[in-house]
Amino acid sequence: MDQNQHLNKTAEAQPSENKKTRYCNGLKMFLAALSLSFIAKTLGAIIMKSSIIHIERRFEISSSLVGFIDGSFEIGNLLVIVFVSYFGSKLHRPKLIGIGCFIMGIGGVLTALPHFFMGYYRYSKETNINSSENSTSTLSTCLINQILSLNRASPEIVGKGCLKESGSYMWIYVFMGNMLRGIGETPIVPLGLSYIDDFAKEGHSSLYLGILNAIAMIGPIIGFTLGSLFSKMYVDIGYVDLSTIRITPTDSRWVGAWWLNFLVSGLFSIISSIPFFFLPQTPNKPQKERKASLSLHVLETNDEKDQTANLTNQGKNITKNVTGFFQSFKSILTNPLYVMFVLLTLLQVSSYIGAFTYVFKYVEQQYGQPSSKANILLGVITIPIFASGMFLGGYIIKKFKLNTVGIAKFSCFTAVMSLSFYLLYFFILCENKSVAGLTMTYDGNNPVTSHRDVPLSYCNSDCNCDESQWEPVCGNNGITYISPCLAGCKSSSGNKKPIVFYNCSCLEVTGLQNRNYSAHLGECPRDDACTRKFYFFVAIQVLNLFFSALGGTSHVMLIVKIVQPELKSLALGFHSMVIRALGGILAPIYFGALIDTTCIKWSTNNCGTRGSCRTYNSTSFSRVYLGLSSMLRVSSLVLYIILIYAMKKKYQEKDINASENGSVMDEANLESLNKNKHFVPSAGADSETHC
């Protein structure tokens, strides 16, 4: 009798072990595929941010408009995110994520298409479309008592030039492609995280989330590396003779091969979509597999019938689902803790998004570093630190079994530390640029009070210069001049790089003693002290990003814990929608609009309209860029304090009682009942179906 009982137990244990193995393997396969999609998602995001400067210059648009283009990703996401979050959890989640990745890839390819339909990039008004004529002969020098119209085209030519002008409406294709990329990215986070939270073992979802976010940082590393590489390549590489291009990557008019970034990221997104189409809807064992035990076979048959009935009911009860959606939506909006947390994260994330969107422009204007160098430093150095912070944040929550209030305190602490390091940026600013007629007078002694009209000096008043031109030259006195003509230069040497100008009369008025009144093409570089400050900036950026990442996992965990278990997916989706709508869309726009106010020299295209900004007042730029971001962060900290106080009143007693009973609140917020009122064990109660 004992032997028969032992055989029966063994027979029952074997299918149980097989089920557990298949279940865990299914979840691990999903995690692997989701990791690939996270890499594709973050790669696309970094590619867009690192290409902002080049898109702005290539299409001759303002920072506020390029911020709007950047926000089109969030617009696309916003269009479908709530419905994907709610109804997507009832459908085949892996396949929906796969479709999203494919659409995201198509959007990336579409973003790059305008490059193939536009003419050659014209970095100067004097630069002809024929690349072979980009030589010093097209540079205007001081032509005393000669007519300026010699350099101007006829109205007919100007009209034709407007049709292919860089600042035309071709940027709309970039807008549409980025929006399509946002639509495709929508299912990845809410459906992926809810899938993990539903099927992971108790307490493991935070660890998995930390691992996912850490792996996702591979995308930014690749993105920054590609951004650095392609930023050094001229935009029309393969189409023009590069030896005739007289500007360098340090020039404010330089445009890199931004379109190659989007081709690479788009193709990678398409590839990442493939594994999801081969994954099951849930990590269950195949229904056709038979159980050894008769009782287990009966249970399995009942489960299959229940699943079939549920699928049938879902198809017939669309109206009921819509009603349930609005009831669920009302439930999360009447949750004061959830609403407060959404508001504070909106302020916090708006600061991050706005600052990161224009960080490359900030580095270029403040420290004189090209975007290619900023890309590689931010990618190679800071991103591994950021990934470590994400992983460590999830590990700390799991290791110390932080309750809801504990997670909120931990998140607030990381925000305080991040702000503390961010404020240090105010102490490592460089002096304002020295640009004659824009930031200082031509004698180099006094700052210019207004830059609405370029003030001329007696040293160039007879040169008949085009004041709208931007062809900067650096005098050997360390001052940048808007053009060789406005520097009073009479002659030049060299048809390619480097080009040197001589007999520059405006250098003489600065009191230069060596009587070598020459200038070379390009803006004057920053001094060594400013370069050292740039490396301090990178070091502080590492610490700032580490603490920002350390609290990243806690954001998701707080959302999961302060709403009902069945509303997790909707709460995550609505939170993401608000962040994207008011943070992702608006933050780049108002950051860009304020940055535009610090511009001191705008380009003018052939249509006579304003193009992109050529140079900024770096001091005003820093005040706007750092000040706005700091104010948003401080405001979020005030809400953090209020949130923690409210959480203590609501959760502290409950957490103490749970601790006394020897239990820990899991991500499903304790055990629940299924639709038929049968008891359904939590993640920790059934080790066979959770990993």
Curated annotation (Swiss-Prot):
Main location: membrane
UniProt note: pH dependence: Optimum pH is 6.5 with prostaglandin E2 and L-thyroxine (T4) as substrates.
Gene Ontology molecular-function annotations: bile acid transmembrane transporter activity; organic anion transmembrane transporter activity; prostaglandin transmembrane transporter activity; sodium-independent organic anion transmembrane transporter activity; thyroid hormone transmembrane transporter activity
Gene3D superfamilies in alphabetical order: 3.30.60.30, MFS general substrate transporter like domains
Glycosylation sites: 130, 134, 432, 503, 516, 617
Disulfide bonding pattern of the chain: 459-489, 465-485, 474-506
Catalysed reactions, as listed in the record: taurocholate(out) = taurocholate(in); dehydroepiandrosterone 3-sulfate(out) = dehydroepiandrosterone 3-sulfate(in); estrone 3-sulfate(out) = estrone 3-sulfate(in); 3,3',5'-triiodo-L-thyronine(out) = 3,3',5'-triiodo-L-thyronine(in)
Listed Pfam families: Kazal_2, OATP
Location in the cell: Basolateral cell membrane; Basal cell membrane
Positions where Phosphoserine occurs in the chain: 293, 295, 672, 682
Tissue expression summary: Highly expressed in liver, at the basolateral membranes of centrilobular hepatocytes. Expressed in liver (at protein level). Expressed in fetal liver. Not detected in heart, brain, placenta, lung, skeletal muscle, kidney, pancreas, spleen, thymus, prostate, testis, ovary, small intestine, colon and leukocyte. In testis, primarily localized to the basal membrane of Sertoli cells and weakly expressed in Leydig cells and within the tubules.
Keyword Transmembrane helix attributed: yes
GO biological process, one term: organic anion transport
Entry-linked InterPro entries: Kazal_dom (IPR002350), Kazal_dom_sf (IPR036058), MFS_dom (IPR020846), MFS_trans_sf (IPR036259), OATP (IPR004156)
Membrane topology type: Multi-pass membrane protein
Residues exposed to the Cytoplasmic side: 1-28, 89-94, 198-216, 281-331, 398-401, 561-569, 648-691
Annotated consequence of substituting residue 193 to R: Strongly decreases expression at the plasma membrane; abolishes transport activity
Record note on what altering residue 155 to T does: Decreased transport activity
Spans within the Extracellular topological domain: 49-67, 120-168, 238-255, 354-373, 426-537, 596-629
Disease: Hyperbilirubinemia, Rotor type: An autosomal recessive form of primary conjugated hyperbilirubinemia. Affected individuals develop mild jaundice not associated with hemolysis shortly after birth or in childhood. They have delayed plasma clearance of the unconjugated anionic dye bromsulphthalein and prominent urinary excretion of coproporphyrin I. Hepatic pigmentation is normal.
Domain notes: A conserved histidine residue in the third TMD (His-115) may play an essential role in the pH sensitivity of SLCO1B1/OATP1B1-mediated substrate transport.
Similarity section: Belongs to the organo anion transporter (TC 2.A.60) family.
Function: Mediates the Na(+)-independent uptake of organic anions. Shows broad substrate specificity, can transport both organic anions such as bile acid taurocholate (cholyltaurine) and conjugated steroids (dehydroepiandrosterone 3-sulfate, 17-beta-glucuronosyl estradiol, and estrone 3-sulfate), as well as eicosanoids (prostaglandin E2, thromboxane B2, leukotriene C4, and leukotriene E4), and thyroid hormones (T4/L-thyroxine, and T3/3,3',5'-triiodo-L-thyronine). Can take up bilirubin glucuronides from plasma into the liver, contributing to the detoxification-enhancing liver-blood shuttling loop.
PANTHER family named among the record's database cross-references: ORGANIC ANION TRANSPORTER (PTHR11388), SOLUTE CARRIER ORGANIC ANION TRANSPORTER FAMILY MEMBER 1B1 (PTHR11388:SF82)
Protein name as catalogued: Solute carrier organic anion transporter family member 1B1
This protein's encoding gene: SLCO1B1
